Amino acid sequence: MRKSTAVDFRWMAAFVLLSWLGEVIHNRIELPQLSLLSPEYSATGLISFGLFLVWWKVSKRWGGILLLGWALLNLIGGAIVSVIPFSFLPFYPEQSLQHYLMHVVYGVAQIPLIVLLIRDLRLRSASDGLKETSHETPAL
């Protein structure tokens, strides 16, 4: 039996959804005045969905790279940097246990997608390397 290198689109869809839901949970608790149609929800959801479609229908490699960048941006920028009161931020984040916990939820929700994408990109890269070497012309 051959080991498959392809990631099932249902797993990818589930982890993209989980990634977005991490942000939704954060925003519902921390920014309850926002409507579900506000850009903080709808724009990020559309970006996530659009990048998933690129991965699924257009290019696994480029879609995976773009999705990985988006998930890392959410993890580093959204879950980590934006909770620390840096002077360069245009806002002062609340320094409370609840706020920290919401950022932990937001960050942890990114990890399954990041792990899946790194695994998928590595397997595809290894698979492409095998294809390239198998097409070489033997030396005479």
Predicted regions and their residues:
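Hydrophobic cores of alpha-helical transmembrane segments in multi-pass inner/ER membrane proteins
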Residues: G45-F52, V105-R119
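Aromatic-anchored segments of alpha-helical transmembrane domains
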Residues: V16-H26, W70-S82
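Loop-to-transmembrane helix junctions at the membrane interface
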Residues: L53-I80
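Juxtamembrane loop-transmembrane helix junctions in multi-pass integral membrane proteins
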Residues: K3-V7, W55-W62, S87-L101
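Hydrophobic transmembrane helix segments
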Residues: T5-T44
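Cytosolic juxtamembrane helix and N-cap/initiation of the first transmembrane helix
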Residues: M1-L18, L116, D120-L123, L140
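Short, highly charged, low-complexity non-transmembrane loops/tails of multi-pass membrane proteins
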Residues: S125-L140
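Interfacial non-cytosolic loop connecting adjacent transmembrane helices
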Residues: L31-L37, L75-V104
